[in-house]
Design a protein with these regions (language model features):
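Short acidic, Pro/Gly- and aromatic-enriched capping/linker segments at domain boundaries
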Residues: 2-17
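Short beta-strand element of the alpha/beta-hydrolase
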Residues: 71-83
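Short beta-to-alpha linker loops that shape the active-site pocket of alpha/beta-hydrolase fold enzymes
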Residues: 82, 113-117
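Primarily recognizes the serine-hydrolase "nucleophile elbow" in alpha/beta-hydrolase
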Residues: 131-188
Length: 188
């Protein structure tokens, strides 16, 4: 065996490989794409925000092309799939999907980037997504210390929706059950 070769301690084909030194190699997934202003195909703008500096939970916000009608838009808090261990809110496929979804649904979207397994085991993803929902709801009272203008200026906090695919659907269920048991800030 090559002295420089690392030994595999666990594999989850075709998704990932974990080495004895703790390195995680993700075998599938699409690459990172930056946020865009005025996507050429949809007119949707996006930007990245840090929700929690302590846990590094972040999100990509999406805003549809604005019309002269300044009516506030529904909010979609979206959780990605990927078996809790692959993909990202910043991946090409998910970015493309959210651009189309936001354009068609005419919503402000918050696409949560939660920490992935196996580095961060459940319930970390649930807690990260709950923190993101609390962050969104904290904007319902206006411009606080950590406010995001796309939410305070364009979002209707009487119309918040949760969505997700695959593992994200599981997170939607968990977060909705938690919202029933615990109150969100400002009674949302």
């Amino acid at each position: 065996m090559d002295s420089g070769a690392q030994r595999v301690s666990a594999e989850l084909p075709p998704l990932l490989r974990v080495y004895e030194d703790g390195l995680v190699e993700r075998l599938v997934g699409s690459g990172f794409v930056p946020a865009t202003l005025n996507d050429p195909q949809t007119g949707v703008s996006s930007k990245d925000v840090l929700i929690s500096p302590e846990s590094a939970v972040s999100a990509r916000l999406y805003l549809p092309k604005l019309t002269c009608n300044r009516r506030k838009l529904p909010i979609l808090v979206y959780f990605r799939g990927g078996a809790f261990c692959i993909e990202s809110a910043f991946s090409f496929l998910d970015h493309r999907y959210l651009n189309i979804l936001v354009n068609e649904a005419n919503v402000v979207a918050v696409f949560v980037e939660y920490r992935r397994a196996p580095e961060h085991l459940l319930p970390v993803a649930y807690d990260d997504c709950w923190a993101a929902l609390e962050w969104v709801s904290s904007h319902s009272v206006g411009r606080g210390a950590n406010y995001e203008p796309w939410l305070t200026d364009y979002a209707d906090f009487d119309r918040i929706f949760l969505g997700g695919d695959s593992a994200g659907g599981n997170i939607v269920h968990n977060v909705a059950m938690r919202a029933r048991a615990q109150s969100l800030p400002h009674n949302l």
